[in-house]
Amino acid sequence: MDWGIFSYVIIGLTSGIGAGFFGMGGGTIIVPVMLTLGYSFEHAIGISVMQMMFSSTFGSIINYKKKLLNISDGIYAGIGGLIGASFSGLILSVIDTKKLTILFLIITFYSFVKYAFNIKYSTNAAPPIKSQFYQRLILILTGIITGIFAISLGIGGGLLMVPILGYYLGYESKRVVPLGLFFVIFSSISGTISFQNHNVIDAQVLHTGIYIGVASILGVWLGIKLIQISSPKLHRMALLSVYGLSMLVTAYNLITS
């Protein structure tokens, strides 16, 4: 096997384990690593989004079999994701790379603080949206908003979807997380097409994304197995270490670029 392909397989396995073990978007691992390997921020995002197609599909199949996924909700959120992510190529082609990298760093830092201090979103006991029509509309709008920002930064949608759906629809996080993973299937496909249409990514990036994506499927499976045998304390320390390392590597690449 070519050493380049071998390294991509290792990256895919690692990001997949992160997704299965921590429930985090692969971008937290993939983007800093690809920046370190000399890829541009746009190409790193493109590779991260392509990887999401594979890991989110595999993860959603598992969630569906475990009856954790509401397909109806997922389709409406997915429609929004298709629409929102279609703008991601335009965003990456017009916004300065350094600004996007800083925003990625801020979001990673927020995630670190959230888990370090065990900050949890409260579910609205009396959600303002009761009508089924408006509930579906909220799902679509949430998908659009999340698709625009999350795919443009190569991150999962849970960080944005959990507080929005928790407030307006009263959804608990354990219901939103599988929904967010299913949403990523739609938004990542739309985002990849948008990246291609705006010449953000090329054939080499597509091939790299496929290698990493296929390897991430095995990584997700391994991550799920690992979480079953690890203690909560070890899981928490490992999660914070990954976020901390991601911030350090991203900040280093930002300063030296």
Predicted regions and their residues:
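Alpha-helix capping/termination and helix-coil
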Residues: L169, F186-N197
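Alpha-helical transmembrane segments of polytopic integral membrane proteins
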Residues: G27, V31, I47-M50, F54, ...
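Transmembrane helix boundary and interhelical junction motifs in multipass membrane proteins
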Residues: F22-I30, G154-I164
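Residue-level recognition of specific faces of alpha-helices
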Residues: G20, V33, H43-G46, I164
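Single transmembrane alpha-helix segments in multi-pass membrane proteins
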Residues: T14-T28, G170
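Residue-level signal for conserved functional micro-sites within the alpha-helical transmembrane segments
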Residues: A19, M52-S55, G59, G81, ...
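Juxtamembrane transmembrane-helix boundary motif
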Residues: M1-S15, L35-L37, F41, I62-L153, ...
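Transmembrane helix-bundle signature of multi-pass membrane transporters/permeases
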Residues: G16, I45-M53, L82, V177-S188, ...
